[in-house]
Every structure is written in C-alpha cells, then in structure tokens.
Amino acid sequence: MYEYLDRRYALALYEVAEEKNKVEEYLNDLREICDIIYGNNELYEIIKHPQISTVRKKKTFRNIFEGKIDDELLSFLMVLIEKDRILYLREKLKEMEKIHLERNNTLLAEVKSVVPLTEDEVTRLVAKLENKYSKKILLKQEIDKSIIGGLYVRVGDDVIDGTVKSRLDDMKQIMLKRE
C-alpha cells in the first residue's frame, strides 16, 4: 500500500548517499539499524508506543546512533520518526537495495536447489542469465529440500521452475484430469 512512499523516501536517501559516494556505507548502516530496531524488544516498544513522544524517540535514536552513522543518515531517521514511518524502515531499505541494483544494471536471481550449487554451476547459470537478460546478475542461493531435485530460478517476475516437485505436481494434475 505504501510502496510508492517507501520508494520516494529510499530514492531521496539514495541520491544523498550517491552524492557523498557512500551508497554501500548507507546500505550497510541501514541493515544494521534494522537489525538493532527489530532485534531489541525494548527499543522496538519505545518506537511503536503511541504515548511516547516524538521528541523522546528522536532523543533515543540520537543517543544510540549519533557519531556512529553519517549525519545525513541520522537526519533521515529523524524525518522518519517525525512522520511516524520509522517502523517501516525495512521497506525503505528494500526499496533502496532495488534502486541500487537498477542503477548498477543488475538483477537479483533467487535460486532454490536441494544441494548447494558448485562454483562451476553458479558460473554457468550466471552467464546464461546475464546473456538472457543483458544485465549483471546477483545470485542468491537458497537450499530447499522440498523441491526434491532440479532448480527453481526467479528473476524479477520471471520464474524458471525445473524442479522435480513441479514435474510431479504436473503429472498429478494430468492424472486427476483423466479420471
């Protein structure tokens, strides 16, 4: 519902980071900040509690992050607190990561397999995907025993499902239609 808004915030921060040549630093800091927020129940409760003032929330963030992150990034967090959007920081981070991939002509390929792919298999798969999409490919591997065998590849909205599980499901559907 708020994807458009998340993207606008992320784009604004990305452009600041790009101007300062600190995109990777900002992305890493945002990941760590998200881990701190969502990994610390006490901090999370302070942030989401409606009766705790914005001033107190900002002070808490300044105490934790001032001097540890870039001032522009801290200002961004203050704006999110002011606009009551700080609980949606993960969404801003995801959008910023998407923008970073787009700006670097890169696509994320999510690959599921039963066993980890060998280095050679990864190299060949990346080469084929780069050839197909004419973009750099960032491969994210996931082990999933439920697929039984084969590969499941998702690049954006495209899915290549070469898993044994999907073949068995297809055969099951054909058998059920015949009965």
Curated annotation (Swiss-Prot):
UniProt keyword terms in alphabetical order: ATP synthesis, Cell membrane, CF(1), Hydrogen ion transport, Ion transport, Membrane, Transport
One MF term in the entry's GO annotations: proton-transporting ATP synthase activity, rotational mechanism
Record bears the keyword Transferase: no
Membrane-topology descriptor: Peripheral membrane protein
Keyword Protease tagged: no
Record-linked SUPFAM superfamilies: N-terminal domain of the delta subunit of the F1F0-ATP synthase (SSF47928)
Main location: membrane
Listed Pfam families: OSCP
Compartment annotation: Cell membrane
Cellular component aspect of the GO annotation: plasma membrane; proton-transporting ATP synthase complex
UniProt-listed InterPro entries: ATP_synth_OSCP/delta_N_sf, ATPase_OSCP/d_CS, ATPase_OSCP/dsu
Subunit structure: F-type ATPases have 2 components, F(1) - the catalytic core - and F(0) - the membrane proton channel. F(1) has five subunits: alpha(3), beta(3), gamma(1), delta(1), epsilon(1). F(0) has three main subunits: a(1), b(2) and c(10-14). The alpha and beta chains form an alternating ring which encloses part of the gamma chain. F(1) is attached to F(0) by a central stalk formed by the gamma and epsilon chains, while a peripheral stalk is formed by the delta and b chains.
Family as reported in the entry's similarity comment: Belongs to the ATPase delta chain family.
Biological role: F(1)F(0) ATP synthase produces ATP from ADP in the presence of a proton or sodium gradient. F-type ATPases consist of two structural domains, F(1) containing the extramembraneous catalytic core and F(0) containing the membrane proton channel, linked together by a central stalk and a peripheral stalk. During catalysis, ATP synthesis in the catalytic domain of F(1) is coupled via a rotary mechanism of the central stalk subunits to proton translocation.
The protein's name in its UniProt record: ATP synthase subunit delta
